[in-house]
Design a protein with these regions (language model features):
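Mobile genetic element proteins and their domesticated derivatives, centered on retroelements
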Residues: 1, 20, 50, 76, ...
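Residue-level marker of structural boundaries
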Residues: 10, 25, 59, 81, ...
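Intrinsically disordered, low-complexity regions enriched in proline, serine, glycine
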Residues: 29, 112, 137-138
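Major-groove DNA-contacting interfaces characterized by cationic-aromatic clusters
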Residues: 31-81
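Catalytic-site neighborhood detector that most strongly recognizes the C-terminal catalytic loop/helix
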Residues: 117-142
């Protein structure tokens, strides 16, 4: 997020492609392209908001967000608190983990989750898929008593 430049974006009919030059899961700096599709509900659509941000900010080159990783962490704390959550429980890492967990709950297969999170092995992404499925995927649910 903090290292995305305007030239890393490619808007296409389906949404936006973002070239990530380097990330925690790509230490060698090979880079990877991620896609954000348009959401049905515009009020939740990150592509719509990104376009609006670029329009308002008049950014045409360089960083799309002039922000540091520490500032992102502070924003996460601020807005989780404003939303009524315990901000101490939230970070960039917990949001990534939450994405993997919610995706799994909605039936997204591990490979697809891995393509978004950048994990190289199923074992690593499984660490992110938290215990949320303990009841959903419980064998006792199959026993009708």
């Amino acid at each position: 997020l903090v290292s995305i430049d305007y030239d890393d974006l490619e808007f296409v009919p389906e949404g936006v492609k973002i070239f990530i030059k380097r990330s925690k899961t790509d230490q060698s700096g090979e880079g990877m392209t991620k896609a954000l599709p348009y959401f049905e509900k515009k009020e939740f659509c990150p592509v719509t908001f990104l376009k609006k941000w670029l329009e308002i900010s008049k950014i045409k080159s360089g960083p799309i967000f002039n922000i540091s990783d520490k500032s992102v962490a502070l924003l996460i704390k601020k807005y989780t608190s404003l939303a009524g959550f315990d901000s101490q429980k939230y970070s960039g890492h917990s949001l990534r983990s939450g994405f993997a967990t919610v995706s799994a709950e909605f039936g997204v297969d591990e490979r697809t989750i891995m393509s978004m999170t950048g994990h190289k092995t199923s074992q690593m992404v499984r660490r992110y898929i938290q215990e949320a499925n303990l009841f959903k995927n419980n064998a006792l649910n199959k026993i009708k008593i």
